[in-house]
Amino acid sequence: MNNVRKEPAKRVTTFDHSGRENGWLVELYKDGAKTTAYLTAAAAGAFKGYHLHRVRAARYVCVRGRMRIILYTMGMVENGQTVWTRQEHVLDASNPERLFIPADVATGLENIGAEEGWLINYPEPAYDPDLKDEQVEYTQAELEAGTVK
């Protein structure tokens, strides 16, 4: 029993782009300074996003409630104008599925259930706090206008 131990698990309150609280996240597993798994929670009706990760892919599994995952993938049209293509996926805890989202895909999370929604994410590579510019925030208006940051 000498190997049994408790470790702190950091919990962070999250906010939308206008500063309103929309849920929280908690680090589930860490490898040194890097977070290899975390749970993100969204209040009923709340939206989290949009953002993309330049180097990190996401792997989501919904373990409570129903979550709509809204994705925007960057593409080009003939005149050189950037166009983001929208795609939606629903993850439901009553029918567990994994959703893989590659790097450079803008992602929004919307709780479409009546209870708090929980998503577990296993990012690849693990979240590294030293990569300061790896996450890029977007608004829906910026994505629809073809903005690239």
Please provide the spans of the model-predicted regions:
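Non-catalytic, conserved peripheral segments adjacent to functional cores
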Residues: 1-98, 112-149
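Glycine-centered loop/turn positions within well-structured domains
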Residues: 107
